[in-house]
């Protein structure tokens, strides 16, 4: 299984792809590889984020899932991986998504791709590693729950991810406030 996110990956893109990676490897006997452009080192605390490939490959996957991509071109240099896969899927939350891939799951009501993924998978199979990554995705696309896309659903899901092991203060401090403090020095 290949996973690809959008160009210039943000916290939701990284959190969603790493969350899905951890969900798949902990529940299914599948080989999985994430493909993303370079991203903020602040996100490397996520379990297995260091295994992400930043280089395209010629490998043909049985399945490639585009995560947090409003259209297929948003995969940038990793689009050929998606196009050459035997089967394709898109998981997204952008209302502008035209629907691409054999299977396309777009939840325009979701605050983030992380929330859309949470709703798509079996929640009782989400482990601590996946919970931390998905929580980071929600936190980033809601601006630490300040943006107008912060909904009751997003807050409820964030609460469930905390129960599954996500550490909110660590994730927020590592990816928001640590950066802000250093920038203000």
Task: Label each PLM-derived region with a short phrase.
Residues 32-34, 88, 134:
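Hydrophobic/aromatic residues located in beta-strands of well-ordered beta-sheets
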Residues 13-18, 76-78, 151:
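Conserved strand-to-helix beginnings and helix N-cap segments that scaffold or border functional pockets
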Residues 2-59:
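Anionic-ligand anchoring segments at beta-strand to alpha-helix junctions in alpha/beta enzyme folds, i.e.
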Residues 10, 20, 43, 65, ...:
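Divalent metal-coordination and catalytic microenvironments
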Residues 47-49, 53-103:
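Active-site cofactor/cluster-binding pocket
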Residues 35-37, 67, 91-93, 108, ...:
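Generic beta-sheet signal
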Residues 1, 7, 19-25, 98-185:
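A structured phosphate/pyrophosphate-recognition subdomain
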Residues 9, 13, 69-71, 95, ...:
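Short, glycine/acidic-enriched loop or turn micro-motifs at the edges of active sites
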